[in-house]
UniProtKB/Swiss-Prot annotation:
Protein role: Catalyzes the stereoinversion of LL-2,6-diaminopimelate (L,L-DAP) to meso-diaminopimelate (meso-DAP), a precursor of L-lysine and an essential component of the bacterial peptidoglycan.
BP GO annotations: lysine biosynthetic process via diaminopimelate
Keyword field: Amino-acid biosynthesis, Cytoplasm, Isomerase, Lysine biosynthesis
Record field: catalytic activity: (2S,6S)-2,6-diaminopimelate = meso-2,6-diaminopimelate
PROSITE patterns tied to this protein: DAP_EPIMERASE
Protein name as it appears in the record: Diaminopimelate epimerase
Taxonomic placement: Bacteria, Pseudomonadati, Pseudomonadota, Gammaproteobacteria, Enterobacterales
Superkingdom: Bacteria
Gene: dapF
Keyword Oxidoreductase (UniProt): no
The keyword Isomerase is annotated on this UniProt entry: yes
Site (Could be important to modulate the pK values of the two catalytic cysteine residues): H159, E208
Pfam families referenced in this protein's UniProt entry, alphabetically: DAP_epimerase
Active site (catalytic residues): C73 (proton donor), C217 (proton acceptor)
Residues given in the record as substrate binding sites: N11, Q44, N64, G74, N75, N157, N190, E208, R209, G218, S219
Amino acid sequence: MQFAKMHGLGNDFMVVDAVTQNVYFSPELIRRLADRHCGVGFDQLLVVEPPYDPELDFHYRIFNADGSEVAQCGNGARCFARFVRLKGLTNKRDIAVSTQTGRMVLSVTDDELVRVNMGEPNFEPQQVPFRAVKAEKTYIMRADEHTVLCGVVSMGNPHCVIQVEDVETAKVETLGPLLESHERFPDRANIGFMQVVDSQTVRLRVYERGAGETQACGSGACAAVAVGILQGLLSAKVRVSLPGGELDIQWDGPGHPLFMTGPATHVYDGFIHL
């Protein structure tokens, strides 16, 4: 099987063309491939499939390193767009794809950055899903001896965003896994730790569902900005600084789609016998 290794700000992927190759990935195989000592090693596996709808270009599937399939990965979407152009699967600059939960348009700019229409953030608890009586800008959550204030949103996948004074000292290693599997998130959640520098700048660390802390999380950056705007902390255009680099996020508020712009890097091509 041929594949490419790619990353978006250090969030790394194994990307596989399932348009011209016949492939099947069991959870066990994905876990073996994800092993950084005995396999290829990655945060997520991205699979390019033929479109389910003739109006679209491709179907986009995402698997975490633990073998679970998820509906959204923003950094992966940028790498997906670069991959299909690099491999000659399309020469379009605006690429329409379906995912497990919806549709996306991926736009490759002249300088090879990728702008992704991530759709409209969804704050309805049952759509996240999140157990709450009604939608709120801020929720109180308790986990063991910890009590935190957070925002909750779906960007096609569930996110919990906590504002912190300093991301460097944030309790990512302890609070991350506690909140990821909290009973109020029936499908688990990605946990973002956001430091607001000013209305146009945030620093962010993300503990990703099924992957742990990563160098960058595109949908997590989108979620953090959406929550920050809803809470009145941020303006419509925000630069998000993650351990792996920076993303530009734009959201004009409820009723509008959110856009993410950032790089996608091709590292190498490989071949593996399964």
